[in-house]
């Protein structure tokens, strides 16, 4: 039996630019946030998760990742304690952070170091398994790598290329290039506002697809988001916080025109706007969260709370998944 335990943490994410348009080949930009998921493995006589038996239907990400190590039978039994600061089903990547943290904990436990590409592939496949075969690598890549991550359908030559990802689906093979961006915005924070309204990503993606099918001219909105994302990337590279904020607000206007905002999101966005450089929904929309770029995070957080949301303050440049030994 392993004499020591392992604790690993991994960050959630919020999307600054490109949601929905990324489905159609445009780039998208995500930021690793301060709020994290924590996984602690402690030697036990059987596999449990927070004291209850490990089960594939209840813990699909964990079971999928264990399969890459040969399954439960190939590993010493552990109690898996899962905790975190990321609300589930909110668009902040809680399941991806769980996958990234559990992967790093198994890597440390078994002393089997993985390459960056291997870690990205295994975490992405766990997300895809849990989502019945389709998942973007954005969430898992941001959780693993930390910082600012750019996902595109091509190699963005002026960014740091990390790895390629592909996934076979019923609609064909999907492919992505994963990059990191060194972004330094001084004196600003992100404030995330959670509406508390759950809106499944697949439903929102389907809603946009149906809108585009009914009115092909709406494709101009996708092209507009792609152009805004590229302007936002340029502003991030140059450290121009005002331009980043402006691009965020522009992005939201287009997303709203696609019908993926909601009354709850608009209420929080309106409340946060006076103290922010830019505001937008983050993620698939319909509910979930919004994000504000601000020089006065406390004031913005208070405004969000006063409007009925739950606020979380985060800085840029948060580290990716990491693990360490603990006393069992």
PLM feature spans:
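A secondary-structure boundary/capping signal
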Residues: 18-19, 82, 94
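DPxDG-like acidic metal-binding loop motif
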Residues: 33-35, 92-112, 116, 147
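Glycine-rich active-site/cofactor-binding loop and its immediate structural neighborhood
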Residues: 287-289
